[in-house]
Structure formats: structure tokens, C-alpha cells
Amino acid sequence: MGLTKIASKVFLPRQKELERHYINPEKIQHHVLKHLVEKGCETEYGRTHIFSGINNYSDFTKNVPINTYEELKNDIDRMRHGEQDVLWPGLIKWFAKSSGTTNDKSKFIPVSNAGLHRIHYKGGADVVALYLRNNPQSRLFDGKSLILGGSHSPNYNVEGSLVGDLSAILIENINPIANLFRVPKKQTALLSDFETKRDRIARECMNANVTNISGVPSWMLSVLVRMMELSGKKHIEEVWPNLEVFFHGGIAFGPYRKQYEDLIQSPNMHYMETYNASEGFFGIQDNPDDPAMLLMLDYDVFYEFIPLEEVNAESPTVVPLEGVEIGRNYAMVITTSCGLWRYLIGDTVMFTSTKPYKFVITGRTKYFINAFGEELIMDNAEKGLAYACKETGAQVLEYTAAPVYMDENAKCRHQWLIEFSQEPDDLKKFGDCLDHYLQQINSDYEAKRSHDITLQHLEVVKAREGLFNDWLKMKGKLGGQHKVPRLSNSRKNMDELLELNQE
């Protein structure tokens, strides 16, 4: 019996347990809240907010405010200096470095031992459990996993404490048995210089029997392309004939799908989306025919949701899981065993089902364009680009968009800077298709575009090859979990990129 067959039997009880998500979702979530509040009683934060007096969800909402990173920053800084029992019991040794706030270059998200095992690793195990359930003929464990991670560094002078990309923290603490199935070597996986790392990963893994790959689509694509260059082959299956699945997350896969399908032409290749972030592991695509993800309810994560239109209100409506509506955009609020209490994570989601609870990621609360009342979100952008690519034979590698508030002719428009891996047959047609489709799916954008009065036709600027990587490198953010900001009301990133595009 092969290793995968043995593993499938090991995962069978969990596969059955996950069926509870269909039967008692609200009950599961309220058990999670009870557990988190009980643990929180042992902390300074819990004493300040009278956790001992919390007996139900209503008490919880009265005693605990909605928090952004700024509200928790001082407590997190104290934890980084070794203080214990601040937001979560005990000493927190690991901090996941995430993209920054208005006031800081980076956020440092605490990762407790409980969070590591009861959120992040549990999520990783469930991805495998659901994949094996859907693919009984899999030979996943008969080869190696290529896990693309970031890097880490010591945290102040706290012994054994680390700061870095979440992926690096996960690799550093991985179960020794799981480590036997992973490539590349840990020293390579945790290198900080992405260009060096990409080359070494390609060289180390080229002759391995890789059956599955995990990572952010943009960075993984870069590694695969480098491996093709070194091997002299055209398609991945010529190097890894047993590759069967890409577990991806971090950014939308849509703009990269065609490039992966061109590179990996095996009919047996699968793609499975996960929603794992520095703050936690939240969703898994449980059905390959449905792009929506199953909300994972029995981890150490309690969920709440704010209607997107109220996210900046002084007293927004906040609902638990049972209060969500299908088809509505929500900002997600989480409470976790990493000491994040009613934390506004910054992502926006839309539920497609409540039996079970399934959702799609629609964007970021800070990544949108609403300069003229058009309310363009990332979900609109991704769908518009996918349509324009389909109509013109293009493939998008990276992009960003920002408003032009008023040019020399007193005209306003959206400006899109796009790096193509496959240029469109006709750039003007690409822009027309994008503009047309955005009007089809966003009535606010359509209204502002009406008769070119408020908004002119969007502008597409072609980025030179490597522009976005050069920009990220200039900012010390090449590789790992760093992402190009897609949409912004500010022109700061756009102006920097346009200037760099001339060099």
C-alpha cells in the first residue's frame, strides 16, 4: 500500500468531522468564542475588558471594541519585547511580518503556539484532507511538496523569538515528519534574497519527484519559469511528471491561470485555493467546480462581519456568522488564539452560500478606487481584466490602478499600469474591453462613465518587463508574501512606478 493510501485512511476521521460545518455551524462558532474568552481571562487585555463577565455574544460585543492594528500596536510591541500574558497567555515567540499601516512600514502579527497548531497547521492539514477526499486516485505523498516561503530574522533580543513572513515561521516550526516530504532544503527555503532563492530552488528541485506545490501564484510562477530556463524544457510535466496540484493563496489566481495552464499542460493538474494570511487560516476551496471557499469554523477563530459600506462608520453594524446575507460585501472581523480581539483584518468577502457557509474574497478594505463615487473594488478589477484578456489573447503578470484626478484638460479617469506576460493583439481594444466590462458589473462605475462627464475612458499604460519586481526590490519587498497594491485612491505608488517605467 502506497503512502498516499495510508495517509487517506489517517485523514478519513477529519473528513467526516468537517461535515459538521454543514449541520451545526453557529453552534461550532459559539463554542470557539467561549474557549477564546476563557483563555483571554488569563491576560491583561481580558482583565481590562472584564472577560470574566462575558457570558454570551452580546456581552462580548459590549465589553470588547472593534480593533485595528493601531489599537493593538502598543500591546504587540510589549509582547515583542518579551512581556507575557498581554493579549494571549504566556510568551509569544513568533511574529508574522505583514504589509504596513499608514503610520508604519510593517505590521507584526503575533503567532502563539496555540494559533500555530490550532489555526495555521490545522488549516494546512484540512487542505490535504479535502484534496484527498476529492481525488481518491491521488499519489500526493508518493513524492515531495515544494513549499515556497519567505524569510525570518531574530526579534529584538528575545531568545528564540522570530519575526518574518508567516510562511517562514511555518517552515521553521514544521513537524519533522512533514519535513521529510518537503523541498527545498530549509536553508534555501528561508533565504531572504528572492533572486538567489529562486535560482537555488529551481536547481535543487529540478530533479526531485515533486507532486504538489504551495505558494503565492506570482512568486511560484517566477520559480517555475526559472526552472524551465535551467532545464531547457517547455512544460513542467517534462520535469515533474507526477505533479498533480497547486495549493495557492495570497492573491487572486484568475490573472495567472492561463499562464499556469500554458506552463503545465497535464490533464491531471488540479488547482485549489486557500485563504491563509498572517492573521490566520480562514477558508479552503472544498469543491473544484466551485470557486467559493468553505469558511473553516472549528479553528481558534471567531468571525464577525461589517457591511462594507459601514466599515468607516463611527458605530458600524457588526454581525456574527448567522447574521450574514448572501451577495453582500463584508469586511471581516476576527478573534483568534493569537491575541487578536475583534480585529479588523482588512479583507472583504462575499458569501455565496450559508448552508454551508461559503464565500469568495472580493478585495481589501484599503484597496479600492472611490475617487469619484465609482466604488471600484478588486473583485471588479480581476473580473474586468479576465474579460479583457479573454477577448484580446493577453496575459497579465502584474498591475496597479489609480485615479487621474484632473489632467491638463481638466479631465478625470482611471489609469491602469499593466505588465503583460503576453501582450494583447490590440492595446486599445484591451482598454475598451476592460472599460466596457467594468460598466457591466459595477453600476456606480457605469453611472460615472455616462457620457464621459465625470469619468473619461480609462487609460492603459504598458509596463516594461520586470517593472513591478524592480519596484518591490527597491522597497526591500521582493519575494515572500509581499504583493503589489492593486487599487488605490492615492497616486503615490502609481507615480513612483511610472517614473521607474521610464528608466
Predicted regions and their residues:
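Short strand->helix junction
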Residues: 114-117, 423-424
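Gly/lys/ser-thr-rich phosphate-binding loops in alpha/beta enzymes
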Residues: 101, 106-111, 122-143, 381-393
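Non-catalytic, beta-rich accessory domains that mediate macromolecular interactions or localization
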Residues: 84-85, 101-115, 238, 245, ...
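Active-site diphosphate/adenylate-binding microenvironment
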Residues: 27, 31-95, 106-111, 118, ...
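Conserved AMP-binding loop of ANL adenylate-forming enzymes
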Residues: 129-178
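Ser/Thr-glycine-rich phosphate-binding loops at phosphate-binding pockets of nucleotides
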Residues: 95-104, 277-279, 351
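Short glycine-rich loop/turn motifs that provide flexible caps or phosphate-binding loops at active sites
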Residues: 99, 148-149, 214, 275
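Active-site glycine/GP-rich loop and adjacent strand/helix microenvironment
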Residues: 1-52, 60-67, 75-78, 82, ...
